């Protein structure tokens, strides 16, 4: 009698295949990250843009592209990238938080606060968003709320306490 069970296990070839369909993307992404670390932001932008030519919806590459643009003081392009991410995923907390930083740089603290609150709504455990909320509230002279947000950020990540001591945004707190 023959066993008619279908073989659903992976073959040895499938498990150890040397082909990585994301090899080029991953290589460009890592190179872009290293260029960012070396403060070669224009070159990093080129790497992330190459990734996006192949996959225009690669959110991870878009986040790094926007962050690089932001640090090149190309705020309008950074904002365009973050808006595109939010078109793909309106609940992306990192995009909301980074968008808040662009508004902060433009000294538009109310808009920055609105964006960072959307980041927190998307991920209530996002410590950096809570920290930034504390900064923005401080800049808007809402000291008690600023302290509450800072306290929450420190509960999530204790390193934020050390950071806040040196942060000029908390001078009036």
Predicted features along the sequence, with ranges:
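Structural signature of tandem alpha-helical TPR/SEL1-like repeats
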Residues: 8-10, 37-50, 71-84, 105-118, ...
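TPR-adjacent "capping" and linker segments in tetratricopeptide-repeat scaffold/adaptor proteins
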Residues: 9-27
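Alpha-helical segment of the N-proximal tetratricopeptide repeat
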Residues: 21-54, 60, 67-71
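Canonical tetratricopeptide repeat
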Residues: 64, 98, 132, 166-167
């Amino acid at each position: 009698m023959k066993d008619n069970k279908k073989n659903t296990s992976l073959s040895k070839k499938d498990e150890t295949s040397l082909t990585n369909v994301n090899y080029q993307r991953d290589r460009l992404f890592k190179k872009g990250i290293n260029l960012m670390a070396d403060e070669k932001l224009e070159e990093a932008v080129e790497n992330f843009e190459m990734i996006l030519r192949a996959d225009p919806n690669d959110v991870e590459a878009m986040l790094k592209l926007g962050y690089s643009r932001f640090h090149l003081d190309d705020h309008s392009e950074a904002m365009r990238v973050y808006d595109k991410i939010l078109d793909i995923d309106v609940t992306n907390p990192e995009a909301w938080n980074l968008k808040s930083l662009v508004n902060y740089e433009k000294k538009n603290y109310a808009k920055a606060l609105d964006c960072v609150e959307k980041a927190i709504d998307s991920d209530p455990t996002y410590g950096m968003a809570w920290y930034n909320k504390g900064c923005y509230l401080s800049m808007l002279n809402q000291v008690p709320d600023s302290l509450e947000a800072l306290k929450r950020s420190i509960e999530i990540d204790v390193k934020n306490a050390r950071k806040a001591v040196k942060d000029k945004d908390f001078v009036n707190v």
